Curated annotation (Swiss-Prot):
Taxonomy of the source species: Bacteria, Pseudomonadati, Chlamydiota, Chlamydiia, Chlamydiales
Family (UniProt): Belongs to the UPF0301 (AlgH) family.
Protein name: UPF0301 protein CTA_0231
Gene3D superfamilies cross-referenced by the UniProt entry: VC0467-like
Biological source species: Chlamydia trachomatis serovar A (strain ATCC VR-571B / DSM 19440 / HAR-13)
Classification via InterPro entries: AlgH-like (IPR003774)
GO cellular component, one term: cytosol
Short name of any one Pfam family annotated for the protein: DUF179
Length: 189
């Protein structure tokens, strides 16, 4: 995996927080960029997992292997809004493909449909989102607050989201691999 230059930032890229991002929701976060333009950017934090149970009336999981459904804090903006990332190509008519085999769709009705669904479909329900005004993300990138990495379905739906930050840095190699070993609490170093 090669670090990407800022000029290649686009939908489907991963923003990996620098160790300099200290504290707050973006500390050690990995953000999937869902939209990027001159007007601004929006993405979803993938590795801030929430341990919650949604009532069956809100989100029916009977057609899913519950181990393939995760809840996370997508970002600090509009935390009451739920964004849905999934691997179900059959719902692509109501979804946007963010990167190969990863779709963003806000309509939960397909979750209850059996047809075309396999128990291997993976889902990530993100509460809230992350957003930047035009030029803001570029400024943060130039200040060294973010690294850019390519994404994949395997990274986004990893079985070990708590290790995603260090795993992505390891895959970037070089100095990034050594950054991945920095303890979260430097007093423990």
């Amino acid at each position: 995996m090669t670090k990407l230059p800022y000029a290649l930032l686009d939908k489907g890229s991963l923003l990996v927080a620098s160790p300099d991002v200290n504290g707050g929701i973006f500390s050690r976060s990995v953000v999937l960029v869902c939209e990027h333009s001159l007007n601004g950017s929006f993405g979803l934090i993938l590795n801030k997992i929430l341990e919650i149970d949604l009532p069956e009336e809100i989100f029916p999981l009977d057609h899913f292997d519950e181990s393939k459904v995760r809840f996370c804090m997508g970002g600090p903006l509009q935390a009451n809004q739920i964004m849905l990332l999934h691997t179900s190509p059959d719902s692509a008519n109501s979804s946007i493909e963010i990167c190969p085999s990863v779709f963003l769709g806000g309509d939960f009705s397909f979750a209850g449909e059996k047809e075309g669904r396999t128990r291997d479909d993976k889902m990530l329900l993100c509460f809230g989102y992350s957003g930047w005004q035009g030029g803001q993300l570029e400024k943060e990138f130039l200040e060294g607050l973010w690294f850019l990495a390519p994404s994949s379905q395997e990274i986004i739906f990893t079985d070990a989201p708590e290790r995603m930050w260090s795993d992505v840095l390891q895959h970037l190699g070089g100095r990034f691999a050594s950054l991945s070993t920095i303890p979260e609490n430097l007093l423990l170093n």
